């Protein structure tokens, strides 16, 4: 199957839904984490802090690496990491000796994916030959709200 620009745009739009899940799912579950595993407020806030800290580090480090590796492998890696981290929210607390360590590992995984998506997605949409780039970029960023 030969992929067209419309496939790239659709995949890009769906990537922002993944980005929204990465940033918003765990905070929605903080009370559940507290009730189920008895985590303190400090531990819960550290999960969100860890997410955004890892994303920022990945943003900084990936800017140059993406040019060497390529956009496609990096986008695939981003989604694999995000999916592994989101699935890890359910599985890793039971696998690790400490539920908190499992949650932190899951957060690091999905934050790495989220950081890559953040760096890659806008340039990909910008590079697509669309007649109305402004509309495509606006639609792209609206998908974050849909996630």
Describe the residue ranges of each PLM region.
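Hydrophobic core of transmembrane alpha-helices in multi-pass small-molecule transporters
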Residues: 99-116
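Central cavity-lining transmembrane alpha-helices of secondary-active solute carriers
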Residues: 46-64
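Glycine-rich segments within core transmembrane alpha-helices of 12-TM secondary carriers
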Residues: 134-147
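Intracellular juxtamembrane helix-capping segments at the cytosolic ends
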Residues: 116-129
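MFS transmembrane alpha-helix packing/gate-lining sites
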Residues: 22, 54-58, 113, 147
């Amino acid at each position: 199957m030969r992929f067209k620009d419309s496939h790239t745009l659709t995949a890009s739009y769906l990537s922002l839904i993944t980005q929204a899940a990465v940033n918003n799912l765990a905070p929605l579950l903080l009370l559940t984490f507290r009730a189920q595993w008895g985590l303190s407020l400090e531990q819960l806030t550290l999960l969100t802090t860890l997410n955004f800290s890892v994303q920022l580090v990945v943003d900084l480090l990936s800017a140059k690496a993406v040019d060497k590796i390529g956009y496609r492998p990096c986008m695939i890696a981003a989604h694999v990491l995000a999916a592994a981290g989101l699935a890890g929210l359910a599985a890793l607390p039971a696998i690790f000796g400490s539920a908190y360590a499992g949650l932190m590992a899951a957060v690091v995984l999905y934050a790495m994916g989220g950081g890559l998506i953040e760096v890659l997605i806008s340039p990909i949409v910008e590079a697509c030959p669309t007649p109305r780039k402004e509309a495509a970029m606006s639609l792209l960023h609206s998908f974050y709200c849909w996630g």
